């Protein structure tokens, strides 16, 4: 039997696999167990009561976290004219149309988020096979295809997270960094859960938010007692 690492032993000692922790206790555990040599992200997994095989029960969208994610986000915007000027003013690193598409085709993708105005989708549509597998394809449901590109850029820079349930009906995203204050992580999680509840499909029946777990980049998941959370709309 393989030897457990020091961190794995610590996790096994500290985290009860069958217990749901008060959010403050869960965050304290994550901070105690975060021993990596870099500032780890705090990730969340939310098990939803949906049937992901049915298109009318899939959950997808985006929300701005009140305290951001702690990440520097580089934004590329496909647009032109006055919208291009507005996107640059809002802080977008890359703005253009055909010339920006050529960069993407050449493999130059130094960005984390792609936004497009509706008139630019004729150009962006040609990049689906490149952007799609990377989760970068703009979509109206996540607010990344919009006539108001400046607002979309500001949202991305302010810590907007995009979410989409996987084939098991689970949402995976980040709610900050392990060096955030506990109250910041709680408020970010509350905001995310509020957005998910608001996005509940009409076809979804029964308990919608079934389980919430938080973890650090290198750590194990800690189940959170939902009664200690306060989802915000």
From Swiss-Prot:
* CDD domains named in the record: Ribosomal_L1 (cd00403)
Name by which UniProt lists this protein: Large ribosomal subunit protein uL1
A Pfam family assignment: Ribosomal_L1
Q: Name one GO molecular function term.
A: rRNA binding
Protein's gene: rplA
* GO BP term (any one): translation
Q: Please describe the quaternary structure of this protein.
A: Part of the 50S ribosomal subunit.
Q: Which SUPFAM superfamilies does this one have? A: Ribosomal protein L1
Q: Function of this protein?
A: Binds directly to 23S rRNA. The L1 stalk is quite mobile in the ribosome, and is involved in E site tRNA release.
Cellular component, GO annotation: cytosolic large ribosomal subunit
PROSITE patterns (alphabetical) = RIBOSOMAL_L1 (PS01199)
Q: Report the InterPro entries cross-referenced here.
A: Ribosom_uL1_bac-type, Ribosomal_uL1, Ribosomal_uL1-like, Ribosomal_uL1/biogenesis, Ribosomal_uL1_3-a/b-sand, Ribosomal_uL1_CS
The superkingdom listed in its UniProt entry is: Bacteria
Q: Give the UniProt keywords, A-Z.
A: Repressor, Ribonucleoprotein, Ribosomal protein, RNA-binding, rRNA-binding, Translation regulation, tRNA-binding
Q: Which family does it belong to?
A: Belongs to the universal ribosomal protein uL1 family.
